[in-house]
């Protein structure tokens, strides 16, 4: 297979968890986010299932890197790497035919999940995502034909990228406003999600909430304070 550097390493790390017990670092991470005990138990039960849902990973692969040009059939594709949704998301751009294979990095209707995970609790993937959106705006023509991994092909890439940027910036504004009174990560769901959060998407919603909170912290717009039980409370920074 042809892949970037980080993806195979992350996949092997996840696959290595198969059949293992949930680590205490993960339990502390979700407890700090405000998980109730029944959701903590669900995390423990579901941990280590990744390897059961994917094919066996190859023992070797061909690494592809940013800026590399790959020939597939009669077309030449330039590699553009995005971040935020995944630590390294490979996209392909054919300048001659004005086609961009975006995968999950640029979708026409929904915004890809951008989450903080227990393995890197202080990460700032939302800023990485915003940087990647601006990078794609600079690298692609607006009328490029975008081939996403979900929904239909589309054009007007610059408009869609700006919509994604504006959506996350607006989300952070709402989270900051909500945190005028101290909130846990699980308390800021209403500021970010219109749909109902269920047991099935609770983990993704939590990871995305922490991504917005970590980005706000990096911008010195909120502060985080742990309580005696290890739960993190977020408060808007004073003006």
Q: Can you name each region flagged by the protein language model?
A:
Residues 173-239:
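C-terminal regulatory/interaction regions
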Residues 64, 86-87, 228-231:
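Short acidic/glycine-enriched loop/turn segments that link adjacent beta-strands
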Residues 31-47, 60-64, 143, 202-223:
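Short flexible/disordered coil segments
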Residues 65, 71, 83, 235-237:
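Residue-level detector of conserved, well-ordered beta-strand and adjacent loop positions
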Residues 72, 92-94, 224, 235-236:
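Conserved hydrophobic "DFG−1" position in protein kinase catalytic cores
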Residues 39-61, 69, 76-172:
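Metallo-beta-lactamase
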Residues 12, 108, 116, 194-195:
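A short linear boundary/processing microfeature
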Residues 1-71, 98:
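Active-site HxH/HxHxD metal-binding segment of metal-dependent hydrolases
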């Amino acid at each position: 297979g042809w892949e970037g550097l980080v993806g195979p390493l992350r996949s092997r790390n996840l696959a290595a968890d198969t059949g293992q017990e949930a680590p205490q670092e993960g339990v502390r991470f979700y407890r700090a986010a405000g998980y109730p005990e029944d959701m903590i138990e669900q995390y423990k039960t579901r941990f280590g299932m990744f390897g059961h849902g994917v094919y066996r990973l190859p023992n070797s692969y061909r690494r592809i890197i940013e800026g590399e040009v790959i020939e597939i059939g009669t077309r030449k594709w330039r590699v553009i790497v995005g971040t935020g949704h995944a630590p390294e998301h490979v996209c392909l751009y054919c300048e001659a035919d004005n086609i961009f294979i975006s995968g999950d990095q640029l979708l026409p209707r929904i915004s890809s999940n951008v989450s903080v995970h227990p393995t890197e609790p202080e990460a700032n993937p939302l800023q990485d995502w915003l940087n990647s959106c601006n990078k794609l705006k600079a690298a692609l023509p607006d009328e490029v034909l975008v081939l996403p991994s979900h929904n239909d092909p589309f054009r007007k890439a610059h408009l869609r990228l700006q919509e994604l940027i504006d959506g996350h910036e607006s989300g952070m504004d709402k989270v900051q406003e909500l945190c005028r009174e101290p909130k846990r990560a699980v308390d800021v769901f209403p500021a970010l999600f219109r749909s109902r959060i269920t047991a099935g998407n609770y983990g993704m919603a939590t990871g995305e909430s922490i991504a917005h909170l970590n980005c706000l912290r990096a911008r010195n717009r909120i502060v985080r304070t742990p309580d005696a039980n290890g739960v993190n409370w977020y408060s808007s920074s004073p003006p």
